[in-house]
Structure formats: C-alpha cells, structure tokens
Design a protein with these regions (language model features):
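Exposed, interaction-prone regions of secreted/extracellular proteins
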Residues: 1-190
C-alpha cells in the first residue's frame, strides 16, 4: 500500500451482517473524494433464492460502489443491479447496473435519501463493461458523482450535509452481494 506523508492510516472495522462484500476503507483524514476503475462482474444467480414478492428477481443483488462517512453522515454511491425501462415499461427482472445514491439522515435535519439515475438506456451498464466511478466534494455539503465507461456517462451533484472540504472523514470502495430484507442478520448461503 502507498500512504501519503502524515496520512492517518485505516484501522480494522467490524463487518456489517446481512451481505457478502469486499470493502476497503481509508483512514479518517481530510479527504476530498475517491475514485476507481472496475470491470463489472459477471453474474450467476442462485435459482433457489428467488424473491417471492417480486417475480423475476432474486434475493441476492450485486453492486459496486463508493461512499464514506463525514460529519456523521454515511453514503453509498455507485452502481447496483436494477430494473430497466423497455419500450416505456419497467422490467420485472433486474437487467443492468444503474447508478444509485444513498445517504443517511444528518443532524442538520437533512433527511435520508435513496435515488437512482433515470431508467434510460444511456445509464445502463452491463457485466464485463469497464467503468470509472468517482465521488468528490465539489462544494460544502455537495458531492459530484460520475460514472464513465463503455461510451456512456452519468454525472450529477448530490447534496450531503455532512460532507465539507477540510473536515475529517473516511471514504470506502465496496463490491457487494446485498441480500433482500437481510440487513443486520447472518448472511444466507447462496
């Protein structure tokens, strides 16, 4: 690993139950953002783990994302396996990776939020495609989120009341298989 001079090094953290994931977290320091390039995973679903409440979907859902924690506010921002719109109709099955943004509530009164990029072909990425993903503090309380690859680009600003230039925080990168309605519980075999 390469560290910057005077960088605060990360420490071991307990894993959150309810999903399979590989997470790398920075130390707590005065960061401005994080970015990386990834080849989106090939997916093979467990036919024994179909979602009984959503025909065509599974109880396991892959995602690749960045995020962090600053000012007591947690963020997850990246790509998740999601439904798409085909000929104006939302698919029952999840068929592509789509950008998503999630933040927890903040002491300032900002509410928690979950949002996706519009369900449009120009914002769909597929297994095996290479993408660059980044989040950066561009102004106090504002992150810029960019996904770029395979001839497509998504870019947006995302309000996050805990994120401010010069504040101490941490950033992360995560590859996950989230499990529907299983947060905080032991992971299910898949």
């Amino acid at each position: 690993n390469t560290f910057f001079k005077d960088e605060t090094r990360p420490f071991a953290q307990k894993c959150f139950d309810g999903a399979y994931y590989r997470k790398a977290v920075s130390g707590k320091d005065k960061w401005l953002g994080i970015g990386g390039t990834v080849v989106l995973p090939q997916i093979e679903f467990d036919e024994n783990r179909k979602n009984p409440n959503k025909p065509g979907q599974y109880l396991d859902n892959p995602s690749v994302y960045l995020g962090g924690n600053m000012g007591g506010q947690e963020t997850d921002i990246g790509l998740t396996w999601e439904v798409v719109k085909e000929s104006g109709v939302v698919s029952q099955e999840r068929k592509a990776f789509r950008p998503f943004m999630r933040r927890t509530a903040h002491i300032s009164g900002q509410e928690e939020n979950y949002a996706n990029a519009p369900a449009e072909e120009r914002y769909y990425w597929y297994p095996g495609e290479e993408v660059a993903i980044s989040i950066q503090i561009v102004d106090d309380y504002k992150l810029k989120f960019i996904v770029d690859g395979a001839g497509k680009r998504f870019e947006t600003d995302y309000e996050c009341a805990g994120y401010k230039k010069g504040n101490i925080g941490e950033f992360k990168r995560v590859n996950a298989i989230d499990q529907v309605a299983n947060e905080g519980k032991p992971v299910q075999l898949t």
